[in-house]
Amino acid sequence: MHPLTDTRWPGVLLWVALYTSDYWCTLTCARMYRGGVQHVVAFEGSYELTPYYQKDVDALRWMSPRFVVALVASVSVLVALWSVSRQEAASAYAFGLGALVLVEAAVHVRHVRNLYIFKRILAHDGVSGRIEYARSFALGLSGLELLGFAFAYLAAWLAEPNAFLAGGVVGCLSLGAQHMLRARGGTRSAGVAPQ
């Protein structure tokens, strides 16, 4: 018995906490970026990589209708997967939960790193100079990082096969591939105008 996948609410509550934390961490880093980080590290376009959230993040909107809609929709999908997994496909919920939660785990590693780097930049502690990221470079880097997590989850799945880890592999592969494809179609400009 596994408490995260054998009952519905622990996994759903974990997902809500991670998804909410992701949005708030993004806004915190975006605020730090505008508060001075952009003079040392400049990103082409929006700080946010996900087009769906760019307007809300650019406006530093703490309560976003888009976020609420996406959260309600994703919780509804998890509840539906739970119902299906009890009736027909026993591993559907664990797979879906893994796809959501393990992608968020990868994203949270990025948030922790950015919070550390941005705090050091704002404190003028250990970082000097200026670097500019074209949008295509930022997307490619994100894609590679997500593919790295997919392979780490795959290694864990090879040691202990289960639907939760399989979901994490597929979720990270999918999002990583999307970012890589968007990077290939993106601009490759050298100069980046800070926001």
Regions found by a protein language model. Give the residues of each.
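Hydrophobic alpha-helical segments at protein termini of multi-pass membrane proteins
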Residues: 1-195
